[in-house]
A protein has these predicted regions:
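Structural signature of hydrophobic alpha-helical transmembrane segments
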Residues: 29-41, 87-99, 168, 218-231, ...
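Membrane-interfacial amphipathic/re-entrant helices at transmembrane-helix boundaries
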Residues: 1-41
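Transmembrane helix-bundle core of multi-pass membrane transporters
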Residues: 124-178
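Short loop segments and helix-boundary regions at transmembrane helix junctions
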Residues: 49-64, 68-142, 240-254, 268-277
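Membrane-interfacial segments at transmembrane helix termini in multi-pass membrane proteins
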Residues: 281-326, 432-458
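Structured cytosolic domains appended to multi-pass membrane proteins
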Residues: 337-465
Length: 465
């Protein structure tokens, strides 16, 4: 028996039926809203990457707020002419007002030499303030002003087939322009001075980006509203950056994430009564951002911590192997590095720990990992021995370290102790080509194991003689 009685069963069945109606797109209005918002998400995600890389994110916010006075003025104009409220006229007014706001930003930044953040703040506050005043006047004008507030917060449920065609046209326009001008927009985003030096119209390209932002913003007024449209422009692009650094992959990934956000938000809004679609879409985009922030394979926190942990493990293992070679070298017990390599003589692990002042529990972990890799052998009496493979690896690490030390001491006039510390930081990221450059820079054929410029222990202890 299900807890809660018959009412709980009825509620559960109703919820299940509502979910399946959405999944199978049985309702015409659901199909319209879902298709329109998905097209909007694709366009916003694609365009948002260029805004993010161009550092023009806030200009989308300024333009979206600048559309409000255009909506109010278009409504007042239609009322003064004795006409009914027309969505096409309202969107046209929003487009003109948004474009004007974008041009004012460009004028203040280039002609008036005002900082971009100040120009954006001026346009956002002035235009939105004017829009609020005009919206109040429109609501008191006696005309049919009902529904104008939906342009602020969004109301996807009111979308029609004409709105879907509009979203589709906007998506096609965004993909067409960004595809045809992909090379120019990439250079504009990454190296503006290079684009300017090659004679490209940087200001015109900026204006084109602003124009696309106006188009996407105006189209998105119905779905998410002018306040939240900026989140749809920025959040999918920001999420995509956690997964890849390749712009060719980032663009489609951002578009797909935008579409997924719109799909999830629209479905949630359809299932939960009185849940605003705009807020639901933005929350879905934010949820994807959190997932990307944590698990993104390029910049996600989880993978960055994993890479840092792996690098730290590699550093510790290198330090232990290098310490063993230096310990054997100081006692003239290092095996011959020519011909067939043999295992090294055993090294007292306790003596090594005492020399380097390492914590015992950490050294035990290092030894276990190196033993699993067949680089060292730990005997029952606490002695550590390098295998032939481990000896070869350890000598490579010592050579890298000493090449760096010599380079820093000869070319940077660094003291031996300072060169040792700096080499500890740099050696773990060396590539074979870096080693070749170091050898060439020293103008001599460096032996396989260069001499130690500052041995930790130049003579064996008295009790070992």
């Amino acid at each position: 028996m299900i807890a809660g009685g018959p009412s709980a069963v009825i509620a559960e069945l109703a919820l299940s039926d509502a979910l399946w109606r959405i999944v199978w797109l049985r309702d015409y209005n659901t199909r319209i809203v879902l298709l329109g918002t998905v097209l909007l998400g694709l366009a916003a995600g694609q365009l948002g990457v260029y805004l993010l890389l161009r550092r023009r994110v806030l200009i989308g916010d300024a333009i979206s707020h600048a559309t409000l006075p255009g909506v109010a003025i278009a409504f007042l104009w239609s009322v003064s002419l004795g006409q009914e409220k027309s969505l096409g006229l309202l969107l046209f007014g929003a487009a003109v007002s948004g474009a004007l706001g974008g041009m004012v930003v460009l004028f203040l930044r280039h002609a008036a030499k005002i900082r971009e953040d100040a120009a954006l703040g001026i346009v956002l506050s002035v235009f939105f303030g004017a829009g609020v005043v005009m919206l109040s006047i429109a609501q008191q004008s006696g005309g049919n002003a009902a529904g104008l507030e939906s342009f602020i917060y969004g109301k996807a449920a009111a979308m029609t087939s004409e709105d879907v065609w509009l979203c589709g046209a906007a998506a096609v326009l965004v993909f067409l322009i960004t595809g045809l001008l992909g090379k120019e927009l990439r250079i504009l985003c990454f190296d503006t001075e290079l684009a300017r030096s090659q004679g490209w119209p940087v200001l015109l390209l900026d204006a084109l980006l602003i124009g696309l932002v106006v188009v996407v913003t105006v189209v998105g007024l119905q779905a998410v509203g002018l306040i939240l449209i900026i989140a749809l422009l920025v959040t999918p692009a920001s999420s995509a950056r956690f997964w890849t650094h390749d712009l060719r992959l980032m663009l489609p990934l951002s578009a797909v994430l935008g579409a997924i956000s719109c799909t999830a938000g629209t479905v949630a809004s359809a299932m939960v009564e009185k849940l605003p679609s705009g807020a639901a879409i933005v929350l879905a985009a934010c949820a994807l951002f959190v997932v990307s922030f944590v698990f993104g394979i390029q910049r996600g926190v989880w993978w960055r911590l994993a890479r840092m942990w792996e690098l730290r493990r590699k550093q510790d293992e290198q330090h232990l192997l290098r310490a063993m070679v230096e310990h054997l070298e100081a006692r003239a017990a290092l095996p011959s590095l020519t011909g067939e390599l043999k295992s090294s003589e055993p090294v007292e692990l306790a003596s090594l720990i005492q020399e380097r002042n390492w914590p015992l529990h950490k050294v035990r972990r290092w030894v276990i990992r190196l033993s699993q890799k067949n680089l060292v052998i730990l005997s029952g009496d606490g002695k550590l021995q390098l295998t032939p493979r481990g000896l070869l690896r350890a000598v490579e690490y010592v050579r890298e370290h000493r090449l760096l030390e010599r380079y820093l001491m000869e070319r940077a006039s660094a003291h031996a102790s300072q060169a040792d510390r700096e080499a500890d930081y740099l050696e773990h990221g060396l590539l074979p080509e870096h080693l070749a450059e170091l050898s060439s820079a020293l103008h001599e054929n460096v032996p396989q194991l260069p001499p130690n410029p500052h041995p930790h222990d130049t003579e064996p202890p008295a009790d070992s003689k």
